[in-house]
Regions:
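Active-site microenvironment of metallo-dependent hydrolases
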Residues: 78-180
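His/Asp/Glu-enriched, well-ordered alpha-helical/loop segment
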Residues: 17-116, 132
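Hydrophobic beta-strand scaffold residues
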Residues: 1-2, 29
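C-terminal active-site-proximal or functional interface alpha/beta core segments in diverse enzymes
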Residues: 3-16, 40-41
Length: 180
């Protein structure tokens, strides 16, 4: 079982993410974010980067063996979505509670603004979400049956005070760093 942070692995020069090797060995994987000061905590980017990296490796391997690209890409957008949802839930031993839309599971849902230009035209909704969306395209989020974001806005009443504390913390860290 591995938690992959493909953006960081590529950006820091650690080589190819483990995605392809884990697929080949039926390894279990989930995604994470790392080094938030250098990378956005955006799971769409993490999933997209991992999918693109594994497809790149497959294509290079095909060129090395046949001098041409693969006839068909063996790793789909649906595969990547499953890595981030039901597979991640399974790794946490929570796949009976979360990770898919099923009766009896918690209602954890993300709803997208379908009328955005980056989704038009949409022939494959999963590919459109993974390749063309980001946090800005999320209309609503439901966690355990309750809205936490609606109509594009976070609805936590504590958010303004949390943002204030975050700004104060950031100022203190920069001040302390510069004072050294």
């Amino acid at each position: 079982t591995f938690s992959l942070t493909p953006e960081v692995e590529l950006q820091m020069g650690f080589g190819n993410p483990l995605t392809k090797r884990l697929i080949e060995h039926n390894g279990r994987m989930a995604f994470g974010s790392d080094i938030e000061s250098a990378m956005a905590a955006d799971m769409f980017s993490v999933i997209r980067t991992s999918l693109q990296a594994v497809r790149h490796e497959i294509t290079l391997e095909s060129y090395e063996k046949t001098n041409k690209p693969p006839d068909k890409m063996s790793v789909s957008s649906r595969n990547a979505l499953e890595w981030a949802t039901i597979n991640a839930a399974s790794i946490l031993s929570m796949d009976n509670i979360i990770g898919s839309i099923s009766p009896g599971k918690k209602a954890d849902l993300i709803m997208f603004k379908k009328d955005e230009i980056n989704f038009t035209p949409t022939h494959d909704p999963i590919a459109s979400i993974l390749f063309h969306s980001g946090p800005r395209d999320i209309d609503s989020v439901i966690i355990n049956g309750s809205f936490v974001k609606r109509n594009g806005n976070l609805i936590d009443k504590k958010l303004p005070s949390l943002l204030e504390k975050l700004n104060e913390s950031g100022k203190r860290i920069v001040h302390d760093f510069l004072a050294r």
